[in-house]
């Protein structure tokens, strides 16, 4: 376990986070030192995005409702807790939305930095700031230190994917928690979450994204469980 404090917020990192990120970075496909460096850059980039995401929850929650937040990172994601905070429903939605906004901000900053870094060079009269769009000439790519470019690219890619995933209206993802804060009926919220999760299972399976498929299956099962409990006597409205 790695423990430290950032901006007054205790942070705990479980070893499973590094294991998961290494697998996603294709550590088992490494055949050279360059491959290994790319995997390490992927892990660092993903860690920056995940930590920034959870710190967004923590700092905004503390600002709005006080208390002492803490951040725990494990597997593929994290959890921000602040049991002593006093938040209204609206403030809870704002705190939840702060996570995806902060992780997206990482990608925006990386995109601007990459554009300024690469776009300050001209080759044949063509500005090269279009690298992030995937149309940078190969000759230009070879003329820059590749580590910096890979790092920026990973930050942009992971930031976009992580933000999009978390904003899906599936409980307990951020999108689902925002939906919970805006809706009165928990049963309806879980039904919507279940429906979206099933759609995502079918979509990700058709694309061959098996890790995402498994993740969505778990979320579908979880929301189906909550929905059945509420339907058979649970407290629906909150």
Give the location of each predicted region.
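Hydrophobic transmembrane alpha-helices and their immediate loop junctions
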Residues: 1-238
């Amino acid at each position: 376990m790695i423990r430290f404090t950032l901006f007054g917020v205790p942070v705990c990192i479980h070893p499973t986070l590094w294991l998961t990120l290494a697998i996603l970075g294709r550590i088992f496909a490494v055949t050279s030192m360059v491959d290994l460096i790319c995997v390490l850059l992927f892990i660092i980039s993903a860690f920056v995005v995940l930590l920034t995401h959870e710190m967004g929850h923590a700092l905004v929650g503390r600002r709005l409702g006080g208390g002492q937040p803490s951040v725990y990172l494990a597997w593929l994601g994290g959890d921000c807790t602040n049991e002593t905070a006093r938040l209204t429903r609206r403030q809870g939605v704002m705190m939840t939305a702060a996570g995806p906004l902060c992780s997206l901000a990482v990608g925006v900053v990386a995109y601007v930095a990459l554009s300024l870094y690469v776009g300050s060079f001209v080759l044949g009269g063509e500005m090269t700031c279009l690298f992030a769009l995937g149309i940078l000439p190969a000759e230009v790519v070879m003329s820059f230190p590749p580590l910096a470019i890979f790092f920026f690219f990973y930050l942009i890619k992971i930031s976009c994917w992580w933000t999009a995933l978390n904003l899906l209206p599936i409980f307990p993802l951020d999108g689902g928690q925002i939906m919970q804060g805006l809706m009165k009926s928990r049963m309806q919220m879980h039904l919507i979450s279940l429906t979206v999760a099933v759609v995502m299972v079918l979509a990700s399976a058709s694309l061959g994204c098996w890790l995402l498929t498994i993740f969505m299956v778990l979320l579908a099962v979880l929301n189906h469980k909550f929905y059945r409990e509420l339907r058979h006597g649970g407290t629906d409205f909150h």
